[in-house]
From Swiss-Prot:
Domain Helicase ATP-binding positions: 70-240
Reactions it catalyzes: ATP + H2O = ADP + phosphate + H(+)
Span of domain Helicase C-terminal: 251-412
Source species: Gallus gallus (Chicken)
Gene name of this polypeptide: EIF4A3
GO biological process: mRNA splicing, via spliceosome; mRNA transport; nuclear-transcribed mRNA catabolic process, nonsense-mediated decay; regulation of alternative mRNA splicing, via spliceosome; regulation of translation
Functional summary from the UniProt entry: ATP-dependent RNA helicase. Involved in pre-mRNA splicing as component of the spliceosome. Core component of the splicing-dependent multiprotein exon junction complex (EJC) deposited at splice junctions on mRNAs. The EJC is a dynamic structure consisting of core proteins and several peripheral nuclear and cytoplasmic associated factors that join the complex only transiently either during EJC assembly or during subsequent mRNA metabolism.
Entry's family note: Belongs to the DEAD box helicase family. eIF4A subfamily.
Enzyme Commission number, as recorded: 3.6.4.13
Segments carrying motif DEAD box: 188-191
Span(s) of short sequence motif Q motif: 39-67
Residues holding ATP: K61, Q66, G86, T87, G88, K89, T90, A91, D343, R368, S369, G370, R371, Y372
UniProt-recorded name of the protein: Eukaryotic initiation factor 4A-III
Signal sequence segment: none
Composition skew (Gly residues), residue ranges: 1-11
Amino acid sequence: MSGSAGSGGTTGSARKRIMKEEDMTKVEFETSEEVDVTPTFDTMGLREDLLRGIYAYGFEKPSAIQQRAIKQIIKGRDVIAQSQSGTGKTATFSISVLQCLDIQVRETQALILAPTRELAVQIQKGLLALGDYMNVQCHACIGGTNVGEDIRKLDYGQHVVAGTPGRVFDMIRRRSLRTRAIKMLVLDEADEMLNKGFKEQIYDVYRYLPPATQVVLISATLPHEILEMTNKFMTDPIRILVKRDELTLEGIKQFFVAVEREEWKFDTLCDLYDTLTITQAVIFCNTKRKVDWLTEKMREANFTVSSMHGDMPQKERESIMKEFRSGASRVLISTDVWARGLDVPQVSLIINYDLPNNRELYIHRIGRSGRYGRKGVAINFVKNDDIRILRDIEQYYSTQIDEMPMNVADLI
């Protein structure tokens, strides 16, 4: 490898290639040259019992990110993978983690950090499902749950721990989570974690890991501050990145409804309710207060909705998610806590009651309404003073958001 020819493993030729890009706002880096494509799961050199789990789970053919990243991770390389929601990124690292385990050794060999409790639990469930024939032990280590239970589970021995950085670090500090056998650290939704809140805690966790630990970082967006951070704890990483303007929104029809004033949004939503319940819909608000207010108001008007935000107790959030997943509730009102990585395939309509506070969140909200290339519809409620933000989002993603047609129900 010629990784020494530049900072953080960017080779000279790669750096020249980056400089050639005229518009740096559109493009981060390109995929490393040595990344080849493995078109089927059968040709990845995976263990038999894992392959059985993959096919039993319903996967047939690897997605683009899986075709590129799994082989590199299994080889032991540090990997930065840029991949939006709905591309199969969770399965990418889950399959790789399962392949690298020594099931005979009942110690933690892989650690996966995620920004929200829900996402950590979803990762854990995915690992248990994919590893169904391997007899894998996997625990979700998350805040808001019983510490004693965590300690008991960890003492029993877990091959993989998925969790939120705060609780994971707490367990390492208490010596309940032993790090000596850890071979791999996965940072999922890294942009969100390294944002503000979890940066310090990730560093704290990282300091306790064996020096040779392999690091895999997965993220929908890669702001430069993340790429700088990867230099600190990755060695000559392979980059598997796509140009930003190819990053999803494909197959998702995006519309806006002009509402002059905030008060008009509610009536607009009520008019749309019959359309919402054709399949399942998620409605995003920017604040917890707004979620509670809107839920209350919808129920007063005799509409059936459920709601979720970060202030709710863990148990309550879990039962709401379960209800929504099973289809028992059709409309979920939420803050951005829902926008990251939560997988409900039936959701084919997203409504931004409020436009997101930052444009990078837009893709996290919308990118899930058309999972795995399925079609979806996104409707943005836009007040007069939001037009500017909408245009900014359009430009940022090189996409088009048209006024909502009358026959929107036919598109869902």
